[in-house]
Design a protein with these regions (language model features):
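Short, charged/polar connector segments at secondary-structure boundaries
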Residues: 1-104, 113-121
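Amphipathic, charge-rich alpha-helical segments that serve as recognition/docking helices
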Residues: 89-175, 199
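Low-complexity, flexible helical/coil segments
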Residues: 66-73, 103-104, 117-120, 135-142, ...
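Charged, alpha-helix-enriched surfaces in structured cytosolic catalytic cores
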Residues: 9, 29, 47-55, 85-86, ...
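Amphipathic alpha-helical extensions and coiled-coil-like segments
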Residues: 132-136, 154, 164-273
């Protein structure tokens, strides 16, 4: 591990090149040209040019960046942003050429934990963002030697106040294909349904998504559980999926759906193989 004195020497030498230096919480803040910055690899949080970004841009124009970002040396030159992607974008939109940052020489796992923890408490985070963020942090903590699946999951959710079980459910969502995960993001598919469907193979999920779009019916938790069971028993196909989705609500027993009705939801070329 590099000593603090060595870190200060390196940061100061960079400051000699670009000027402007101050100290925040004992760490040197340096102004870095924004064209030397690179996004964090597989950054799971979306940076939108929305109304909130407009407000941030106006604040940056008026007051500058009040909280420096955190970066680390990038292998090909420049710096990888660990914390501060929205501030970086705001600087671009505000027409600034530099951004104040703290440069840390940290490994991938440490950088991942910082990246997730500095974003996870935002109010407008999508389920998909949490899913991939929690998965990345979980894997990072495991690499760092965290023992036990349950204990690690609890550590992952500690910053955001999520239980270990909730973290595990979010991580399951990372196994969904993008089309189904989008439905979870827009609240058309509940998280519990998405979690159950995440156990299906990619091909099975594609069949479910096609059926959902054709029937315009979102699976209930009970239907998703039934679909999952069919998958575990190696019995899941298009016919089974349509049959389960078209079951009448609150029926005590299974309902037989006619081949003619099921076939009406398929393109002509696909009907023979399904019915």
């Amino acid at each position: 591990m590099r000593s603090k004195s060595a870190e200060k020497v390196k940061l100061s030498s960079f400051d000699d090149l670009f000027g402007k230096e101050e100290t925040v919480s004992g760490e040197v803040v340096t102004s870095v040209p924004i064209d030397l910055l690179h996004p964090f690899k597989n950054h799971p949080f979306h940076v939108q040019d929305d109304e909130k970004m407009e407000e941030t841009v106006e604040s940056v124009k008026q007051y500058g960046i009040l909280m420096p970002g955190i970066v680390r040396p990038y292998p090909d030159g420049g710096y990888e942003v660990v914390a501060g992607h929205r501030r970086w974008r705001a600087c671009e939109l505000a027409g600034l050429e530099e951004m104040p940052v703290i440069i840390r020489d940290i490994d991938d796992d440490t950088a991942t934990v910082i990246m997730v923890d500095t974003n996870i408490q935002r109010e407008d985070i999508l389920p998909s963002e949490k899913a991939f963020a929690y998965k990345m942090k979980y894997e990072a903590l495991k690499h760092q030697g965290s023992k036990g699946e349950k204990y690690t999951a609890e550590m992952v959710g500690e910053t955001a106040g999520d239980s270990g079980r909730t973290v595990q459910r979010y991580i399951r969502l990372a196994n969904l294909i993008s089309g189904l995960l989008d439905l979870v993001d827009v609240k058309k598919v509940p998280m519990i349904v998405g979690e159950k469907l995440s156990y299906l193979t990619r091909e099975e999920q594609e069949l479910v998504l096609e059926a959902v779009r054709n029937c315009e019916i979102m699976p209930t938790a009970a239907q998703a559980e039934a679909i999952k069971m069919f998958s575990e028993e190696k019995k899941l196909d298009g016919n089974a999926i349509y049959g389960l989705l078209l079951k009448k609500k609150n029926s005590g027993n299974g309902v037989t759906i006619s081949a003619k009705k099921i076939s009406s939801y398929f393109p002509p070329a696909d009907r023979k193989s399904v019915v």
